[in-house]
């Protein structure tokens, strides 16, 4: 339901296996192995990815699977029970680069982003196409907003993993 939750919304349309599994996953209503496998079975064959996972227990395993599948670079992120970067808590990152897996924690302040409170972030949840559009516009026009920061953080991670920036911090600046 967040601003960048594209995979979950589009998986059924663009991934043949998810066409069948998606409705069953929704009916079950709990996290399953499909939440872990889905992002790693990218139909585009991406060799560089930023993937979120709901449990820190899965991060190293996912990074190792990505390495074995031939990924060149990847970041598997988790923060406070969620499968995404956070602005209100540290994010644990397991990074695959040049065949080597490393892990570290990152705080928003380390990336020159303002730490946010959960109340700050409550306003960046889209519950309709209209509110999603409003958030996108806000992220593009108000560079001090929480929406702009979360877009910069996620885009910055993609820029870094894509090899355009030499660090996550520089990726965030470029975004």
Feature-to-residue mapping (PLM):
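Short, small-residue-biased leader/transition segments that mark boundaries at the very start
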Residues: 2-7
């Amino acid at each position: 339901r967040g601003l960048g939750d594209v995979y979950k919304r589009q998986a059924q349309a663009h991934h043949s296996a998810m066409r069948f599994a998606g409705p069953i996953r929704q009916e079950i209503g709990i996290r399953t192995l499909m939440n872990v496998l889905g992002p790693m079975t990218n139909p585009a064959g991406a060799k560089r990815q930023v993937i979120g996972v709901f449990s820190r227990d899965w991060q190293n395993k996912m990074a190792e699977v990505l390495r074995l599948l031939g990924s060149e670079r990847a970041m598997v992120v988790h923060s406070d029970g969620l499968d995404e970067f956070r602005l209100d808590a540290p994010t644990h990152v397991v990074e695959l680069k040049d065949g080597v897996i490393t892990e570290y924690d990152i705080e928003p302040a380390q990336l020159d982003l303002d730490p946010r409170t959960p109340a700050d972030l409550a306003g960046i949840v889209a519950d309709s196409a209209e509110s999603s559009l409003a958030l996108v516009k806000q992220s593009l026009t108000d560079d001090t907003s929480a929406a702009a920061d979360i877009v910069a953080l996620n885009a910055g991670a993609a820029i870094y993993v894509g090899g355009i920036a030499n660090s996550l911090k520089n990726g965030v600046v470029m975004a």
